[in-house]
Each structure stands twice: as C-alpha cells, then as structure tokens.
C-alpha cells in the first residue's frame, strides 16, 4: 500500500512515488517524504524478506551524509552506535609504518565539519532509518520487481509489476536497488523502445567496469585494535583498510587488483569457496605497524561475516528517463576506499526529495504528465551534479590505485610524500563534504554550522575554481618580471663593476677580498658589498628606503612559509625565495606573487585552520629579521667604521641563510613543543597577535625610513625614486648604478600593488569584504603617501589576514549574525 499523507487544506494533489529498494537511499528518501510540507505518497518495494539483512558490511558515516541524517532526526540514534575515529595508521606490506606517528586527522575532520568520522554496521543504519518511518506499512518486503510498464501516453501513470504478480501504480519510479539495478535496466529498455527520452543505451551499458575485488567483513574485538582506530596497509596490487568501531567491533576490507579489467557482463562473481581461497593467500598480511604484530589471519579467525565481491566502477551519463529515476549505486558506482558511495546516495536522496517537493508545491490539480515529471527530474540529472559525482568517482578510483601502488607515481608519492603529507587526508574528506546537498524544506541543524569549515554548496570536489582564469589574471606579474629583467640589465654597469671587483678597489675605497674564506661565498657577496659602498656615497635614500620596504615583503613571505595551507607547495621554501631575490628582487618577487595567486585561491582558506601558521616559527620572524636583515643593512649604511660597513655588507648578502638558521635554532631550542597540533583543532586564531606585532613592527620601520627620506632628503622624491627613461649612454658608473637600483624598486613596488589588487579581488568575489574599488584604491594610496610602498603592502596584507580569520564566504552555511 502507498503511504497516504494527511489531507492538505490547499487541496494540493499528492504525488505518488514507487521506491524500488529498501536500502539506505530508499529509506532515507521515504523519511524525507514523510517530513515534506506537501502531500507525497510512497511505497517501498524491497526484494529481500527483511528490511535490514546481515550482509556483513560496515559503512563509514561522514559529515556530508550525517548532516542529512541529522535533518531527518535519525542521527542522534546512530551516534550512539558509533565510536568516532580518533587515530589512524598506515603501514606497508612488511608492516613498517609509513607515517612518523599515528595521525589524529579524523579529529580535524570533526573540528571542521562538526560531525565525526565513524564506522557502523550497514544493518544498524537500515534499522534506525526504518525505526523512524511513521508509516511502516508502506515498506513492503519480498517484493522483487519483474518489470516496469511505462506508457507513451503523457498522462498515464507508471506501473511496477512484481514477480509475485502484484503491481503498483504511481507518478514516478525511483530505482534505489543497487549496483545491479533492475530499475536501470528497465529504464534503458524504455529508452530503446523510444517510449521516452533518447540517449545511447549501449554506451551506458559499457560504462561499468571492475579492476579490483574486495573481501569485506566484520570481526570481534582484537587486543591492540582499540575502538576508534583505523589502519591502512598499502602494498603492490593489494591493500587493506581496518577500522575498529563501537565496543571494539572490527570492520575490514581487503582489496586486490584482478588480473584484468572486466567490463559490464564480463565482471566475475565469487562464492564462498572463492572467498576462502582468496583469504588464505593473505593470512600473513600485516594489519598494523609496531609491536602488535596483528595480521589478517587474526581478523579471519575472529570473523563474524566475510564476503568476496568485485568492485564495480561506473559513471553513468543519464540517471533519468521519463518517469524513471535512478538513485545511489544504481546511478553511479565507486570503490569504497573513501567511504563516499553511501554518503553520496544520501545527498542525492535529499536532492530528489527537494525536487519532488517543489513539483508538488506548484499546485497541479490534474495528473502530472510525463513531460512535466521529466522536466522536473532534469534538475536532478543536471551537469553540475554529474560533475561533482564524476569527480568523486575519479577520486575514489585514484585512491584505490594509489593504495595498491599501481603506478610509479603512486609508489613515489607513498614512499616520499605521504610521511610529510600532514592533514592531506582530512583535506580530502572535507573537500568531499563541504559542497554536500541538504534537504531544503527542513531546518539546517545548528550543529552543522559551528565547525571550522562550514558547508558551502559552491565549494568542494567538482566545484573547484579553474586554474586557467587565475593564470590569465596573474600573467601581468610574469610580464613585470621579464620587464624588470630586461630593463635593469639594460642599464646595469656590469663591466665597470667587474673591473672594480677585480681590482679590489672602488675609487679610493678598498674592497675586501675575503670574508667567508670561501671562494663561492665571497664571490657571491662582494658584488653586494660594492652596492653598499657606491650607494652610501652617491644615492643613499633610495636604496635605504627600498630595503626597508623589502623587509616588510620578507616578513610576509616568512609568515606564508609557516602557513598550514602552504605546507606542501613551493611557498613554504622561504630560503629558496630569499636567495633567488639576491639575484634580483624585481625579477623574483613578481614570480613569487604569480605562484602565490595560482596556488592559493580564496577557497584554500574555507577551513579556518588552514590559515593558521606554525607559531614556533611565526614568533621568530620579527627578532630574526631585525637581527639578520635590518641590523646588517643599517650597519652597512650607517656604521662610522668603514670596515664594519663592508663586513655588514657581506653578512647581509647571505642574510636569508642566517635568518633560516636562526629561525630553526630558536624554534627548536626555545619554542618547543609546538602548539600547532592543538591549535588547529581548538585555537585557530592563536597566531594572530604575533602576526599583528610582526607586520606592524616591520611597517613601523618602513614608515620611519620613508618619513626620514621625505623630510631629510634635499632632493625631490621624483629624482630619488623615478628612473630616467632616456638612453643610458653617456652616464657615469654611479648614475647607471643608481638607475639600476631605481628600476629594481619600481619593479618591486608595482607588483606589490598588483598583488594586493588580486588578493582584494578574491575577497570581494567571495563576499568577505564589500568595499568598492574606489575605497580600496584611496586606502592604498593613503598608506603609500603616509608610509611608503612597504607600509601599504604590509597593512593591506594584514587586513586581509584579519578578514580570513574572522569572516566566511558568502556561500557558507553559517548561523546568521544577530
């Protein structure tokens, strides 16, 4: 019988839905229908004789699905059955750990998304979902579908006929009957008979393939596998995932790559004899690294259930046709490596409920036509949703292949990058979850809006910003780098400089030949020493102001190098950027900005903890920068003893090296243990006071030098800072050297401003700020007038930092501000 909702005062005609399959997707959809604000009748036809059979499978509950379960009012019951994952380990086929220590990355997922990762029996999820259904008589077991009758007549209902001869009529059929979906086959038949829609059915039939087989099971507790632990074992062509749930119950999956890739009807099936033979091959396969010495044989001996299946993968291009719609594994199938499949089925059940609710709310009094239903269902079968689903299928497939070390790249990543990957697995889980769907006609749970990474339908897997528009926007920075290179080196008096260095004398000043007593280091540094000698004698103010501004940039670069979001990219290599700039600030600062803009779109900071920096290093920035950059720079210009000036010049030329060594020493000796691991979970703004002090301190120095230049120089600012655009012919060595440094500063200052424009454009696009470009421009101009280019750079960047720490993207689902 169909569940009939109570009559609605507005006389809306109820929509009749036949759900094939009483699994997680089908039961969730039924729960959503019962809570709809419009009349929706439904019946669930389940082929098995019980609604919650023991098939020996565990399911990972992840935030994307938990929010929907919370909306349905079932999550509290499920949470009692779950022990949240608290620690994770990864080892190789010999039992050697691939991580420096067990990871708490699952706790970070909880802190970000407000729902923990946890494992539970699939049967328990079904039992809880069924428990919350009010009209249980609408859930029928032992009802195996035989066929679907879909009429060409627009207003005729669709009919489902079961193998026992019973039949059911409704407005549409939802196929939630799994990977071997009879509904999907019937939908293809209807299309082939030209009853509705038109797409390439043969291509759809070829979409399914299987490259892996999986033995999954449940075992009773084993000492050493405590509740809340997960362990992965990675080896060539075989891998294993083991998770310990409530009361120590163990859920496990043993994956193996099959000899070939099978397609569609070629995909093999396995029986109990195959399962036993398969298991015996891997009795010695390690489960966990360390002294526990737990092997697969221990799981096998304590098994409660064990099943061997092929792992189908399919990305079907069409989920609907006429009055038929596929849901869950019947529409898309992926490997279980990331626990995505079940959660995606919940999401799509929510989407389908939203669409059907809107369809009924339109107030149709007459029976809905096939065209009307098809038009509504096209919102479900849309490009955006396919893109996100396809991305998840590819992601889980890539995970399966990496865990079995399928390619050379996979083996290199596991061997060399995985130990340093930090929270990359949390990033992957959260990227899967952040863009999750929800039930639109039910309140969003308050719990889901309190995490460090709010849900956002515009973010996440399948919704990532394309890199190419960012490349195009940032291309002018590369143009500036090239222009700086060509312009500076067109005026640089290299021959005269080499001559002075070779003679070890500039005019009447002797140039020190050795300082480090290393030919490589001394030769590298002497040219810079010449810069200080020449500029101090002939054009003091411009380089003095320039290198004060450069200190602000260097401080920002050091903060960015300590940022969690930049842990695995080139921005973390502060020493590299520092030494490159010694070959030309105007060349490599724009390149740094280009890399930064490409690598850190605004979505990088959707999780507040990714903005966080390692405070052990951030605390050292101001003192070590003052000691290694500013002190040596000031001494090289202002010391009354000429020999001290040259010594300071030698030291300054390698200040990035001394700075890096000082940072490492201070961080390890005086600022340990690092609080980063705790801060990322519960104190993500802990570094802000230190960052403020650092940048404001550097800006104060830059402003003081700028004001000193403005008020103490007898020359005009134009003559001090603006290079001559005419030919360099006929100019003296000193004049050419001055022009060289002026161009160096010009092609440092312009990229600074352009980078700030790009960063603020990101803030505006995300709705993080609402100021217009006129206000932003006048703010930047005012800062330049008051404190110079370096102060503008530092304070505008610091404002952005405050915004990133305290505001949310316009699409974020958060509690409204009272």
Swiss-Prot record:
Does the record bear Membrane in its keywords? yes
InterPro entries membership = FAD-bd, FAD/NAD-bd_sf, FAD_mOase_fung
| Cellular compartment(s) | Membrane
Key words, A-Z:
FAD, Flavoprotein, Glycoprotein, Membrane, Oxidoreductase, Transmembrane, Transmembrane helix
Q: Which residues are glycosylated?
A: 614, 683
Cite the SUPFAM superfamilies for this sequence. Answer: FAD/NAD(P)-binding domain
Which residues hold FAD? 46, 60, 122, 329, 342
Recorded E.C. number(s)? 1.-.-.-
Q: Which domain of life is it from?
A: Eukaryota
Its signal peptide is: none
State the deletion phenotype. Answer: Does not affect the annullatin D biosynthesis pathway.
Query: Transmembrane ranges?
Result: 471-491, 539-559, 571-591, 621-641, 647-667, 743-763, 778-798
The UniProt entry lists the main location of this chain as membrane
Q: Name one GO cellular component term.
A: membrane
Q: Name one GO molecular function term.
A: monooxygenase activity
Q: Does the keyword Cytoplasm apply?
A: no
List the membrane topology term(s). Multi-pass membrane protein
* Family designation: Belongs to the paxM FAD-dependent monooxygenase family.
Q: What does this protein do?
A: Highly reducing polyketide synthase; part of the gene cluster that mediates the biosynthesis of annullatin D, an alkylated aromatic polyketide with a fused dihydrobenzofuran lactone ring system that exhibits potent agonistic activities toward the cannabinoid receptors. AnuJ does not seem to play a role within the pathway.
Write down what this protein is called.
FAD-dependent monooxygenase anuJ
Origin species, per record, is Penicillium roqueforti (strain FM164)
Name the lineage.
Eukaryota, Fungi, Dikarya, Ascomycota, Pezizomycotina
């Amino acid at each position: 019988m169909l569940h009939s909702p109570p009559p609605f005062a507005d006389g809306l005609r109820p929509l009749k839905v036949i759900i094939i399959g009483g699994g997680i997707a089908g039961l969730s959809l039924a729960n959503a229908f019962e809570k709809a604000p419009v009349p929706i009748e439904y019946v669930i036809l389940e082929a098995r004789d019980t609604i919650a059979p023991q098939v020996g499978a565990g399911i990972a509950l992840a935030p994307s699905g938990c929010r929907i379960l919370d909306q349905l009012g079932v999550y509290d019951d499920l949470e009692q059955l779950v022990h949240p994952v608290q620690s994770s380990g990864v080892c190789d086929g010999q039992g050697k750990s691939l991580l420096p220590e067990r990871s708490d990355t699952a706790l970070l997922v909880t802190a970000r998304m407000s729902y923990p990762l946890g494992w539970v029996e699939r049967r328990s999820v079904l039992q809880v979902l069924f428990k919350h259904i009010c009209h249980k008589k609408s859930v029928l077991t032992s009802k195996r579908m035989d066929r679907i009758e879909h009429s060409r007549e627009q207003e005729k209902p669709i009919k489902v006929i079961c193998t026992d001869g019973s039949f059911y009529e409704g407005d549409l059929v939802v196929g939630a009957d799994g990977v071997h979906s009879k509904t999907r086959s019937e939908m293809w038949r209807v299309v082939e008979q030209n009853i509705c829609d038109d797409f390439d059915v043969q291509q759809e039939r070829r979409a399914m393939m299987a490259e892996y087989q999986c033995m999954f099971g449940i075992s009773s507790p084993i000492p050493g596998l405590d509740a809340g632990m997960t362990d992965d074992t990675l080896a060539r062509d075989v891998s294993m995932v083991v998770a310990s749930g409530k009361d120590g119950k163990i859920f496990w999956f043993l994956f193996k790559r099959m000899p070939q890739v099978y397609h569609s009807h070629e995909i093999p099936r396995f029986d109990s004899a195959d399962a036993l033979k398969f298991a015996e091959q891997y009795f010695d396969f390690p489960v966990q690294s360390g002294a526990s010495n737990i092997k697969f044989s221990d799981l096998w001996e304590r098994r409660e259930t064990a099943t061997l299946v092929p792992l189908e993968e399919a990305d079907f291009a069409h989920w609907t046709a006429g009055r038929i719609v596929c849901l869950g594994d019947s529409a898309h199938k992926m490997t279980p490596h990331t626990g995505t499949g079940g959660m995606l089925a919940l999401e799509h059940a929510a989407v389908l409920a939203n669409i059907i609710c809107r369809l009924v709310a339109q107030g149709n009094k007459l029976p809905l036509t096939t065209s009307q239903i098809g038009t509504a269902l096209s919102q479900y079968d849309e490009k955006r949703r396919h893109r996100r689903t396809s991305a998840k299928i590819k992601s889980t497939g890539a995970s399966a292949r990496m865990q079995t070390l399928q390619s050379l790249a996979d083996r290199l990543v596991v061997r060399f990058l995985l130990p340093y990957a930090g929270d990359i697995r949390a990033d992957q889980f959260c990227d899967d979850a952040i863009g999750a769907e929800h039930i639109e006609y039910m309140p969003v749970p308050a719990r889901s809006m309190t995490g460090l990474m709010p849900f956002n339908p515009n973010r996440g897997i399948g919704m990532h910003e394309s890199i190419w528009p960012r490349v195009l926007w940032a291309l002018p920075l590369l143009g500036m780098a090239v222009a700086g290179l060509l312009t500076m080196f067109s005026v640089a008096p290299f021959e005269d400089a080499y001559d002075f260095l070779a003679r070890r004398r500039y005019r009447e000043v002797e140039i020190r030949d050795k300082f480090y007593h290393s030919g490589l280091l001394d030769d590298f540094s002497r040219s810079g020493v010449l810069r200080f000698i020449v500029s101090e004698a002939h054009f003091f103010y411009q380089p003095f102001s320039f290198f004060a501004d450069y200190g602000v940039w260097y401080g920002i670069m050091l903060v960015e190098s300590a940022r969690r979001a930049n842990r695995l990219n080139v921005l973390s290599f502060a020493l590299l950027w520092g030494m490159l700039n010694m070959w030309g600030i105007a060349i490599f600062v724009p390149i740094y900005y280009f890399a930064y803009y490409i690598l850190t779109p605004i979505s990088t900071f959707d999780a507040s903890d990714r903005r966080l920096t390692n405070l052990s290093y951030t605390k050292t920035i101001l003192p070590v920068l003052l000691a290694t950059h500013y002190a040596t720079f000031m001494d090289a210009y202002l010391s009354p003893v000429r020999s001290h000036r040259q010594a300071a010049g030698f030291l300054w030329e390698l200040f990035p090296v001394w700075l890096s060594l000082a940072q490492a020493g201070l961080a390890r000796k005086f600022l340990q243990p690092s609080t980063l691991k705790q801060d990322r979970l519960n104190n993500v703004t802990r570094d802000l006071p230190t960052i403020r002090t650092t940048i404001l301190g550097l800006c104060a120095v830059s402003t003081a030098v700028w004001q000193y230049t403005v008020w103490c120089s007898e020359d005009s600012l134009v003559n001090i800072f603006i290079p001559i655009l005419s030919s360099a012919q006929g100019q003296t060595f000193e004049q050419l050297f001055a022009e060289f440094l002026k161009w160096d500063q010009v092609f440092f200052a312009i990229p600074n401003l352009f980078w700030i424009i790009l960063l603020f454009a990101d803030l505006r696009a995300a709705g993080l700020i609402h100021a217009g470009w006129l206000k932003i421009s006048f703010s930047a101009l005012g800062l330049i007038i008051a404190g110079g280019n370096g102060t503008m750079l530092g304070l505008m960047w610091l404002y952005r930092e405050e915004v990133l720490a305290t505001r949310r993207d316009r699409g974020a689902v958060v509690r409204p501000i009272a």
